[in-house]
A protein has these predicted regions:
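Intrinsic-disorder/low-complexity, polar/charged segments enriched in Ser/Thr/Lys/Arg/Asp/Glu/Gln
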Residues: 2-8, 48, 62, 75, ...
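Hydrophobic pocket/interface hotspot
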Residues: 18-22, 28, 49, 67, ...
Length: 145
């Protein structure tokens, strides 16, 4: 089961201000309690972030993000590997109300349990994925801005 994401949302700060907040990687686990492990040092090209995510389901997802391209304050694109693999991209653009943020990704499970779960219970896997994204945006607004 491949999970594709194409989401856009508005945040009430200018792109440069938003980028300054997003670049504070040392605060990620404070903002996002479901991010159980994070060892990233910077939002910069050629960085590797190790992550463990706990959705509201009885499993954790462990993966790394290799930041391939980073263009401040506009975009970051990374290759994902581990329990899931694929790519993800964050793009930030100006909007009259602040910043237009777009997240796109194509991810697929490599872990045997997640592959089986994706085949047998695709809506549950999608729920977990969507829950993490929804929580991330909500908690970023509440805790980072």
């Amino acid at each position: 089961m491949e999970v594709r994401t194409d989401r856009s949302f508005l945040l009430p700060v200018a792109p440069a201000t938003l980028w300054a907040h997003v670049s504070r990687v040392e605060h990620f686990q404070d903002w996002w309690p479901w991010l159980r492990r994070f060892d990233g040092r910077a939002l910069a090209a050629d960085q590797r972030w190790g992550c463990t995510v706990q959705p509201p389901l009885p499993y954790q997802v462990r993966f790394t993000i290799d930041l391939d391209e980073v263009e401040a304050p506009v975009s970051a694109r990374g290759t994902v590997s581990g329990d899931i693999e694929g790519w993800a991209q964050l793009r930030i653009g100006p909007h009259v109300e602040g910043s237009d943020v777009r997240l796109t990704a194509e991810l697929a499970p490599t872990n045997g349990f997640l592959r089986v779960a994706g085949r047998l219970a695709a809506p549950v896997v999608r729920f977990g994925h969507d829950w993490v994204l929804d929580a991330a945006v909500r908690q970023f607004r509440e805790r980072a801005l």
